[in-house]
Amino acid sequence: MHKKAVVLYSGGLDSTTCLAIARAEGYEPYAMSFSYGQRHSVELEQAKRNARPMGAVDHLVVEFDYRQVGGSALTSDIAVPKEGVGSDIPVTYVPARNTVFLSFALGWAEVLGAFDIFIGVNALDYSGYPDCRPEYIAAFEAMANLATKAGVEGKGRFRIHTPLIHLTKAEIIRKGLSLGVDYGRTHSCYDPTPEGLACGLCDSCRLRLKGFAEAGVADPVAYATIKNPEVRSQESE
């Protein structure tokens, strides 16, 4: 019998790869996505279309409005930076977002009787978000086992799986391709056009393009400002 696992699934490149890995490792994946007022909701639409074809047993979309909190270019009128990937934590950071997401995942996991949670965080080719670091994940896992009925009663130990955390974006892409992931059915851009095209200039687009260039594979998604993503990604490094 396959073990159940909750997989945080945004519809982006990393989380799609993470879902494929969970399934390949023999888990029954229960995908969880969020509609939280994000400006790049086209990513969520990809998640809705692809969760079950990707092998998810169930797909739960949690709805809440992070715009009430604000403080991020993804949930307010703050402009999304287009100058390149910097060294400081960017304004696209959503305050405590992974803590909120993982808490929802933990709650669902406890209800399902699942003790495994997958999240596609990465600490190499990323924008410097503090809630993507290994020490954060370790701290949340410890908290999960202290803060739940299942944890304190010893019914099992919750584990937070981060299979991408020490991989480069190119390595993530190669891994996904080896598992049959169709990256043309993913979305990464923080600031897409009204038609849903990726901008090609935000942090997320730049990291994605760089990853495909280093993997030696053309990015299959359409960009509003780039005619040849493979060439553009090499030039932007």
From Swiss-Prot:
GO terms for biological process: queuosine biosynthetic process. Binds 1 zinc ion per subunit. Keywords: ATP-binding, Ligase, Metal-binding, Nucleotide-binding, Queuosine biosynthesis, Zinc. It comes from the Bacteria. Zn(2+) binds at residues 189, 199, 202, 205. It holds the Pfam family QueC. It catalyses: 7-carboxy-7-deazaguanine + NH4(+) + ATP = 7-cyano-7-deazaguanine + ADP + phosphate + H2O + H(+). Pathway: Purine metabolism; 7-cyano-7-deazaguanine biosynthesis. Its cofactor is Zn(2+). CDD domains: QueC-like (cd01995). GO terms for molecular function: ATP binding; ligase activity, forming carbon-nitrogen bonds; zinc ion binding. The keyword Zinc applies. The keyword Ligase applies. Its EC number is 6.3.4.20. ATP binds at residues 9-19. Catalyzes the ATP-dependent conversion of 7-carboxy-7-deazaguanine (CDG) to 7-cyano-7-deazaguanine (preQ(0)). PANTHER family: 7-CYANO-7-DEAZAGUANINE SYNTHASE (PTHR42914:SF1). Belongs to the QueC family. This is 7-cyano-7-deazaguanine synthase. It comes from Geobacter metallireducens (strain ATCC 53774 / DSM 7210 / GS-15).
